[in-house]
């Protein structure tokens, strides 16, 4: 897998653009773009990726890659089956019921929990059958609710495996099920899933619009869903260059009302709000604030491996941004990799950090660790 800088240079030349032209189209400086292409600096903002992709007229995944070489082959084989399950089903209820509904409801809950535990291969293997079966029970409200949850799980799994368009198809199917159900809380939950899929596609303006719309009708006492949507508006505001403070403060207040932080598998809790604050600070380029916030978080309080993995990655990004020693950054990334191998190795910002470190290769001891991780990420061949 090529580094992001190498990919950008290849795409720029393919488009027949000079560095000056790309700078003009993206709003970034020629010097900064040159450093990115030559792996002398790491891209540390999603907005930067979006700007470059827009200037090159390519998708975000064309730049970040789909991680095919380094993803879990067992998990990856599920993508075609999931696609078939979604494209061969609808909500017309014409098919005879498959399976016992109570067992399907339990399976939905289990797979959502397993995805949060980074068990991608297991979840991917079992999702297609579950999706097919749930579509045959759509005359029952509980099946529609379960379908909203199952498609949300599907969207997040697909997004994590680089199948961004499939993530949108899954999330949109869940929204269709929620609309059929007609319950505002579930419609808002499904809308949140759509915002996550859109963010994976780089469509942050659209994600913000959907989140803001859902906040108009989500029940006042649905603190977890309201909080997740509010966090989305805050983060997208950061990506779009705005001020996320008000939204993040509001989310923090909502989190105080939540007794069980993983309702609807959203992990909406005070520590998770801090994690979103860290991500927002990183997007603003305020690495010092991100590092300060990260120092206040006990990863154990995040309770699920998927969020712990994300926290370790964001903490590493913050430390890298304030030029802490490579050893400290690597230690966090290696911990993240142990918790969530694929989530860590396919993260574009992790790849950028490792690519830049690899190009520098400081001291021998650090270089050995960098090369090891770069090899596991499929980057060593480009060094």
Feature locations, PLM:
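DNA major-groove recognition helix of helix-turn-helix/homeodomain DNA-binding modules
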Residues: 27, 47-62
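Short C-terminal boundary/hinge segments that cap the last helix of small helical domains
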Residues: 57-72, 273
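Short basic helix-loop element that most often maps to the first helix and adjoining turn
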Residues: 6-25
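Short, charged recognition helix plus adjacent turn
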Residues: 65-95
């Amino acid at each position: 897998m090529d580094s992001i800088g190498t990919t950008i240079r290849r795409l720029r030349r393919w488009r027949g653009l000079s560095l000056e032209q790309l700078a003009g189209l993206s709003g970034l400086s020629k010097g900064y773009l040159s450093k990115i292409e030559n792996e002398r600096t790491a891209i540390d903002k999603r907005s930067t990726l979006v700007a470059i992709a827009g200037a090159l007229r390519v998708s975000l995944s064309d730049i970040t890659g789909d991680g095919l070489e380094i993803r879990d082959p067992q998990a990856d084989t599920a993508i075609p089956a999931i696609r078939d399950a979604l494209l061969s089903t609808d909500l017309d209820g014409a098919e005879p019921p498959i399976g016992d509904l109570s067992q399907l409801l339990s399976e939905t809950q289990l797979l959502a929990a397993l995805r949060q535990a980074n068990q991608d291969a297991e979840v991917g293997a079992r999702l297609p059958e579950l999706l097919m079966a749930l579509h045959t029970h759509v005359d029952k409200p509980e099946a529609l609710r379960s379908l909203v949850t199952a498609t949300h799980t599907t969207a997040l799994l697909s997004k994590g495996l680089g199948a961004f368009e499939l993530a949108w198809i899954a999330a949109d199917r869940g929204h269709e099920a929620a609309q059929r159900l007609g319950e505002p809380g579930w419609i808002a939950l499904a809308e949140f899933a759509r915002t996550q899929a859109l963010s994976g596609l780089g469509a942050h303006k659209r994600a913000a619009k959907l989140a803001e719309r859902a906040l108009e009708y989500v029940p006042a006492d649905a603190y977890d869903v309201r909080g997740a949507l509010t966090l989305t508006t805050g983060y997208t505001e950061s990506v779009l260059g705005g001020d996320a403070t008000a939204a993040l403060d509001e989310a923090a207040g909502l989190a105080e009302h939540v007794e069980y932080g993983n309702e609807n598998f959203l992990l909406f809790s005070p520590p998770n709000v801090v994690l979103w604050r860290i991500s927002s600070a990183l997007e603003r380029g305020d690495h010092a604030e991100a590092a300060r916030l990260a120092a206040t978080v006990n990863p154990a309080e995040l309770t699920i491996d998927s969020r712990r993995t994300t926290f370790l990655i964001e903490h590493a990004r913050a430390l890298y941004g304030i030029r802490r020693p490579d050893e400290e950054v690597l230690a966090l990334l290696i911990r993240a990799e142990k918790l969530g191998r694929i989530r860590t190795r396919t993260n574009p910002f992790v790849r950028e950090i490792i690519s830049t470190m690899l190009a520098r290769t400081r001291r021998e001891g650090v270089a050995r660790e960098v090369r090891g991780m770069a090899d596991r990420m499929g980057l060593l061949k480009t060094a």
